[in-house]
Amino acid sequence: MEIGKNVKRYDVLREHGGILKVTRGDVTTEYVSEFCGASHSRTQKNLFVDRSIKDKLDDILLCGIPKNTDYPKPSKWNAYYALVTTNSQPVSMPNIVVIDDFEKLVTETVDVVKLTGTGEQKEYQVLSPTEKEIPILPFDGAGLVTPECASRWAEELDCRSKRTGRRYIPSCFQFRCLPAVKGEAFTFDLKQFAREKGVSKIVDLGGREWDIFTDQIDMIVTKSQFKFWNLYLDNVGLFDCQKWKSAFEEEVHGYRRTFNVAKYADAPEDIRNTSLLSYQPLQTVRFTPEEAEQLVSDSVSTYERIKSSVDEFLKYCGVSEEAEYIKPYYQALQYNHALANDTYVRGKMQDDIKRMKNELLSGKQRIHGHYEVFCPDIYGLAEFAFGLEVKGLLPNPWTIYSKYWTERGVSEVDVIRNPHIAMEHRVCQVITSAEMQKWYKYQECTIVSSMYDTLAFALSGADYDGDTVCTTDNVQIINSVKRVMESGNGNLIVKDGESGKELKSVIISDVPGLMEVNARGYKNNIGSVIDRVTDLWTLSELYPECRKYIKIGTIVGAETIDFAKTGENASFPVEVLKFLKDKKKGYWMRYLEKNLAAAQNESLSMSNAEYFGGDPDKKKRFVDYDCNMNRLCHLAEQKIAEIDKQTEVVAGEEFDYRTLLSGNVHVNRDVYRKVQILQDEYKKLADGIRASYKSKDKNEKANISLRYRMFYEKCRAELLYIVPDIDKLLDMLILIYYTKRDFRDNQKSKDLLWNAFPEEMIARAKSENINKQVDFKKLSVKHHKNNLAESKKKRTGKITIASIDRSDCADNEVIFYKEDREEIRKLILKHKIVKRSDNQVKYERLIAVLLYLSRKMNMQTLTLRNNCPGELSYQNIAMLADVNNDFIKPALKSLKECGAINIETMQSGDLKIDVLYYGKPFGEVWFCTENYNQAGVKIRDYFRMDKAA
């Protein structure tokens, strides 16, 4: 269930025991709140399960933990209990030893932010830099697995190189195990280590001694990985590993628990040599003019190659690198370069090239470097596990081991991590030795870090449970980071003081109590914190106080991320919010994907302000401040403009659609009609998704992809039901889409063709036979299901205005009187707004619709949004009045000039409309309804051409 920012409905569910009733036909099913993990909380979602299975599900997931357990940190419980919802694959159960965490102190000069108070009274004070001892967990989130066990898992998971198909043993595995045992297991030869060091005994977290050989230990798990270790204690309060193992191995309700792997490291040959670095790491440094020129030139040269070569374009799309998903038309383009001149494929290429252009203009840079899993000094972890002095193999701070960079002779890299708020860069020396190559033998795709520095803390509080870091040898970035560090502006930022708020414990079976914690978590938004810090970086060269505010933002960001541990919300202090209140965004931000609509709206609002009377300059949303990102943006603009003048989008040989045909066919009339219907459905689906798309959250993207995939599967089934011969059908579809006027000139229309029949279209591009048999029985079942689904959802002719439906005025009945009709007609005639009778009817309908909506909203201001099908928009007003969309804007201007309405243009380009003409609410009733669709019918039926004056 998606909660969103409005938690009123969620509160009602909480008050009713967290039970959600869903009715399908005549059957009502009760669902109950069960999971709200960290990712759910970030996206304001809650996972409900069928109430009838909840008790059994809890019996399995709790793994022996009593249901009446009173847990002191409910936010942590919610986060870890929901780990089971992540996707993973079962592997053979390892023999595990759970050991304590190793702690140590490192001394470093840090910037301190002192925290006092709690909640809205929380205050942040930035203190002077000071030298301080920082406690660290050098192996936080990390464990070790023997090569023998790793080899078994690799076989069970079928770990193969994406590029070559070679079997390999991954450097590490991200694992999941009940209850809430999670982290990264790094491949390390524990037994060889024990033999060479002459040791074999390992003491676990509860003080019990194990022998790696006689007990056949496969894996070492640290306390930081076993989240609920303190719920498995013996009579004297010590961790009892056997108590957990017995509960884990017990069969419950016919279910046997498993040890699972969620992800594992790539094969070395699959590592990409380049990465697209986001704007965040670039905004925290300052480049010299020469550095900026070189950095932008390197990225723009990639743009030039992609634009001028089909092969380079395909390489950019990942076709030659076995990416997880390649769009079917690009797979086809790999075999038939002539498709680059097909208007549909060419349009897709232009869209992707434009997307890359916007990435460059928004400051993103393509660099030599890549992401790998962040790894601790696992030699030191092995020393600790066997009770030896913990030294590790990386003896100095700010050193790393990387097989990738060592093989390329690189001795210095910048290490970067997102989310990047303050200055999550650290320049490290790449070192190696014979001992490192021996003991880090399996660490082919990780960045091994030293235990003598605060690198993990500096990288936005990273740990070793699967976090990834980017490393690059880019000289411009490395030199700029060094300058920042030398100036003292790159110190580690730490918090002094904790919240004084006492957190209330919750019984883990108390569903409403846990939901209350969820509701608090929904208020947190790390994205908004990062956005505000970005604004501060944009202004930092103009306003010295921004540096102080950025340090505060770093702590606010850390507190927001740590909600699962603390259960307390975090927000910027009022001082910072007041500073940012009237500040515009940087010019470069207009090119960010999330701001493209805002940039268009800026142009629209400035145009509207000029059109309706106002100051266009006040509508500007992006300002050309003197800052690092704006300078990079302008450099990219200049270079890309020069390339665009000289280079057309790549053109191959001439394309002839007939090369995709396999024979001579005539288009079946039923197929043509069905394609028309499906195209209309596709447009409605795409419009609806576009209107409701709110974020770039991967879960939302996955949901959107699923909706499209289900639609394409429906299209495939419906068309094959008409013509089961797939070769004939495909020939008909190709003829329809390439020769029929309704489709050939519509660039997006071929989405259905390429996505409903992807493999077949690729085969046609390769001039291969399809030779597929269609199972008509299965096809008939799908067709029947599609018909049932279609009949359920048909609501012909109705629109939805969500802003009204979810408001307090949703149930308001509106009375229209016959006198209203006459007054509306008099208004139009009196002011001589129109001369033609057909336009008179349109104006009458428009003012009647606006008057109805205004009365329904208790005469509140109406917000008219641009291109938002689910809101009060030009489109919905036009549909209610049955007029053309293009008619609305000039008509509103005329109504404003005659005093019927007042219009204010917003920064977004939206219009605020106050209906000044109230009508005369008295006399004989014309109609009374709370339904705006019914009101639209009444208005359209009365104001007609045959009744015009």
Enumerate the language-model features and the residues they cover.
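Short, cationic-aromatic polyanion-contact patches
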Residues: M906-K938
